[in-house]
Amino acid sequence: MTSPEASATPFEPKKILAQLPHMPGVYRYYDTTGAVLYVGKARDLKKRVSSYFTKTQLSPRIAMMVTRIARIETTVTRSEAEALLLENNLIKALAPRYNILFRDDKSYPYLKLTAHRFPRMAYYRGSVDKQNQYFGPFPSAWAVRESIQILQRVFQLRTCEDSVFNNRTRPCLLHQIGRCTAPCVGAISEEDYAVDVSNAARFLLGRQSEVMKELEQKMHAFAAELKFEQAAAVRNQMSSLATVLHQQAIEVGSDSDVDILAVVAQGGRVCVNLAMVRGGRHLGDKAYFPTHVESALTLAEGGLGEEVEPAEAVDATADAPVDTVPDQPAEEAGSARGAAAASVEAEVLDAFIAQHYLGNRVPPVLVVSHAPASRDLLELLSEQAGHKVSLVRQPQGQRRAWLSMAEQNARLALARLLSEQGSQQARTRALADTLSYDSDDLATLRIECFDISHTMGEATQASCVVYHHHKMQSSEYRRYNITGITPGDDYAAMRQVLTRRYEKMVEQAAQAAAVDEAAGIDGESTRQAEASSLLPNIVLIDGGKGQVEIARQVFTELGLDTSMLVGVAKGEGRKVGLETLVFADGRAPLELGKESAALMLVAQIRDEAHRFAITGMRAKRAKARQTSRLEELEGVGAKRRQRLLARFGGLRGVVAASVEELASVEGISHALAEQIYKQLH
């Protein structure tokens, strides 16, 4: 890796370019603040990076980026495939401004069959292991739960936790309604249950005909042995399976595992719709909306995009494969790329495939709406997956229907997003006008809202939610545990949370001002500018005059502008639409009509603050009630406490256990079991 230049040394690209090798690798551009502008890969670092500084006809946006480059770092790799993998990891980690970015959904849901002797069927998110069986990934939690319901109806596998399974003495309701064979009480043998598990696994893998054929043979065998009750049970199972297959006839195809990727660009935004087929069943889809698209695409339009060797789309039913472009030097490739320049959709699809599949499971077939990634990317995906990954560009039959449906869903999702963005921007403008907030760019308007939640003074929590860039910013939400107050004193709770929230910001502004004053700069101007950059423009308080008065006192003590404080007082009967806005700077209360766009935004932010506060309060209260007694036990640490809860299913089960049962738990001796029993009784 090249070492960054010292900050005092002026940026001289010629010296850096002269030192670059003719080798594959990854390059990174930084600005004067150290922020990453762009991450790219190259089969020849010297030629690739030099092209940014030697070409004379750069687009204005590319030229602007080049003028901002203050530092270049490169990393040499052994191959272009390694460079591609490193580039993808760096884009995810650094989020450069000029790269297309997708939200990193690290955890897709799976359907899990555990390694228990009576395997449990469960919804699962997280990293997979080799001990259990995993089916998926699925595009949504709904798709997993629907599959679980189908398997319950047909194969009657258990879904209960192991701690519940180990402690049952009679069948649960699921057994009574025909959704579980009750292995917990020995209603089915381990061998018969294993057969059901095997059939369920084959069903998920798309081998439904095999399952149906074996069930039919089993039914005839029972009938020949005059075991008519068993034959009737198998017949009912076949009937349930046939019903499921009939209901899903439109979805089921000959393909086993296929992903369908459709890209649509409209109104300055792009949507990638990912539909998943697993075991021949269409499981639904999910829409993705990348950011930084415009900035990234200017690089491609200017002939400075990624060095892509288009992949050949292959399929026996495809009309024709996509033409490939042979390897060319960087300076010669520009004209070829200009003649067959990738569309916006193709560039976005390149980024999506790299960021979505590298490091994740890849199906054997990707049906795509545009010729996407380079052959290097496909080879890397195939190597990672352990099987060949094929791209289908012009599908036929069922695959064409799937792609058409994915494209339509992408258009609908994009239209919905654009409509919501327009509506949200209109609400922001309405609120700004109502509060006489003047700004040329309303996207910079930052609103913070506070709410207090507790139950009869127990587990008091305050929440702070943030509205910025015309939407709620959940990553900036914060919860505050309120302590040292009289239980139920909402005023004291509001005083504490506002002080804790803004006192640090005021201190940071004061410290910056002190530094500037020491350097002979106007410290007061610095303090005001620093405070403005840290503080919100509007602070909403969920409450009336009393809460607003407390907020006014806190802001006055901190030297903050009280005009940004707005209370949201509930109307008569606490009905939505009858709220009154209360101000801390002496303005008269303001009542907005039910149809007011400004009130709709205020209610949206206030309701989100309430939801965030109450969920945190409930979790805190539940944790205190369920674990406090176990945490107080002498000789019982976190691991032993976890084993007790897993063995007995909860605090109630631990309390009801005998000394002998407690001693049967790993890590708990008979003497400790007696001690635990005495402390709980």
UniProtKB/Swiss-Prot annotation:
Protein name from the UniProt record: UvrABC system protein C
Organism: Burkholderia cenocepacia (strain HI2424)
Residue span, GIY-YIG domain: 22-100
Subunit structure: Interacts with UvrB in an incision complex.
SMART domains: GIYc (SM00465), HhH1 (SM00278)
Record carries keyword DNA damage: yes
Known function: The UvrABC repair system catalyzes the recognition and processing of DNA lesions. UvrC both incises the 5' and 3' sides of the lesion. The N-terminal half is responsible for the 3' incision and the C-terminal half is responsible for the 5' incision.
Primary localisation category: cytoplasm
Location in or out of the cell: Cytoplasm
Any single GO BP term: nucleotide-excision repair
